[in-house]
Structure formats: structure tokens, C-alpha cells
UniProtKB/Swiss-Prot annotation:
Keyword field contains Secreted: no
Disulfide bonds: none
Annotated metabolic or biological route of this protein: Pyrimidine metabolism; CTP biosynthesis via de novo pathway; UDP from UMP (UMPK route): step 1/1
UniProt-recorded name of the protein: Uridylate kinase
Length: 239
């Protein structure tokens, strides 16, 4: 099998929940090390990697207190949770021998650089992993939308949406054992079949700007490497 990557630059979208492992909330150290190990594999192939991280694993712990809270305030809390995850991810990357930088859409100069497009692109070209934190920096936008936005700004070849399921299925594979994984599906087909790939705003951005999406499971050993090498892993959503 060829070891030449199918993509030169990728944007990896990680949900905060992916960092929980089997825990009910928070960050599972073993899980984050496993994810970083997969990222290291593709960096060593010469692939430039940007990461957008969610914050659900941390925000879940304070969600009861946020019930009834002003939506914008709750969203800002969620953004700060993504910064915590980004710092944990960077720490694990550093320990694994990777060079990583955190850029935040919210100004937190003591712990993260502000998001600057040109600087982020320079880091990618230098082989550094760039972790984009705090979503878009605006309430009412999800981290899926932030991933679509950063992916376009970084001129990535593809957006990789890492989930707990190894692709997009005809039905929920946990409930229906006869559900079949799509190898590929167009944006229009995904809409007509009501397939839940990501939130509507992010999906529309990717479709309109012709940014393909690959949905795969980050919990399958070596899955990220196989995706980057262009192997049959996950589901490709394309124009």
C-alpha cells in the first residue's frame, strides 16, 4: 500500500466528548494520548495538521448550572471549555514530541496566541500542529462551524470529522444492526436522505465552498492514518 498521503493539509475536527473516553465528563488521559498518537503518525508522513476542538466534555459538567442562562453567556462558557481542551491537547502533543501552537479566537494572551491567519498558515508550513480554540469567538456558532471556517481560511484539502462512529450510515448502527455505511455520498444526497453529518451552517459552508468532509472514528487504531493515505475508511462527503 502506498505511503504517499492523499492530502497535504488537513483540518481535524475533534469533539470535546472524544476526549472523555469512557468517563462521564472531563479529559481521559489515556484517550487523549491515543488521539495524539494518531495525529503524530500523520505528521510524520509530512501532512500539515490543524485541529479544532469542542468543549462538550467540560461544559457537560456545568450544564445544570447553565440551565436557563442567557444563550450568549453559555456559549462563551463553552468557548472557554474549548481552550482548556486545547491546552490539554497541546500538552499531550509536546510530551509526544510534536510541536504545537494554540490560537484562540478569544484573547487570552497569557495562555494562548490570538488567532492570526497568516501566522497559523506559517506554523502549518513549518510542520507545527495548530490547535484552534474558542470556536469562532462568537456566540450562536458551533465548533463544527468554526472547523468549516478555519478549514477554508487555512486552504486545507479536506476536513476530517472525528467521531465515535466509523462513518455515515443508512440508519443508527447502534439501534439497527442492518445499517450500512456509506463509502461516499454527495452533499445533495446527504441533504435529501436527511443524513446528520454536522450542523446545518457548517454543512452549508463546506458545500458552498467545495470543502469535502470525511467522517470517521478516531477510536479505531490507525484510522486517521488510513484516511490520510486515501484508504477506505469512514465516509467521504463530497461535491
Amino acid at each position: 500500500m502506498s505511503q504517499v498521503p492523499a492530502y497535504k493539509r488537513i483540518l481535524l475536527k475533534l469533539s470535546g466528548e472524544a476526549l472523555m473516553g469512557d468517563d462521564s465528563y472531563g479529559i481521559n488521559r489515556t484517550t487523549i494520548e491515543q488521539i495524539v498518537g494518531q495525529i503524530k503518525e500523520v505528521v510524520e508522513l509530512g501532512v500539515e495538521v490543524g485541529v479544532v476542538i469542542g468543549g462538550g466534555n467540560i461544559f457537560r459538567g456545568v450544564a445544570p448550572a447553565a440551565a436557563g442562562m442567557d444563550r450568549a453567556t453559555a456559549d462563551y462558557m463553552g468557548m472557554m471549555a474549548t481552550v482548556m481542551n486545547a491546552l490539554a491537547l497541546k500538552d499531550a502533543m509536546t510530551k509526544a514530541g510534536l510541536i504545537a501552537r494554540v490560537q484562540s479566537a478569544l484573547t487570552m494572551q497569557q495562555i494562548a496566541e490570538p488567532y492570526v491567519r497568516g501566522k497559523a498558515m506559517q506554523y502549518l508550513e513549518e510542520g507545527k500542529v495548530v490547535i484552534f480554540a474558542a470556536g469562532t469567538g462568537n456566540p450562536f456558532f458551533t465548533t463544527d462551524t468554526a472547523a468549516a471556517l478555519r478549514g477554508m481560511e487555512m486552504n486545507v484539502d479536506i476536513m476530517l470529522k472525528a467521531t465515535k462512529v466509523d462513518g455515515v450510515y443508512t440508519d443508527d448502527p447502534k439501534k439497527n444492526p442492518d445499517a450500512v455505511r456509506y463509502q461516499s455520498v454527495t452533499f445533495d444526497e446527504a441533504i435529501s436522505r436527511n443524513l446528520k453529518v454536522m450542523d446545518a451552517t457548517a454543512f452549508a459552508l463546506c458545500r458552498d465552498q467545495h470543502l469535502n468532509i470525511k467522517v470517521f472514528s478516531i477510536f479505531k487504531n490507525g484510522a486517521l492514518r488510513r484516511v490520510v493515505l486515501g484508504e477506505d475508511e469512514g465516509t467521504l462527503v463530497h461535491c
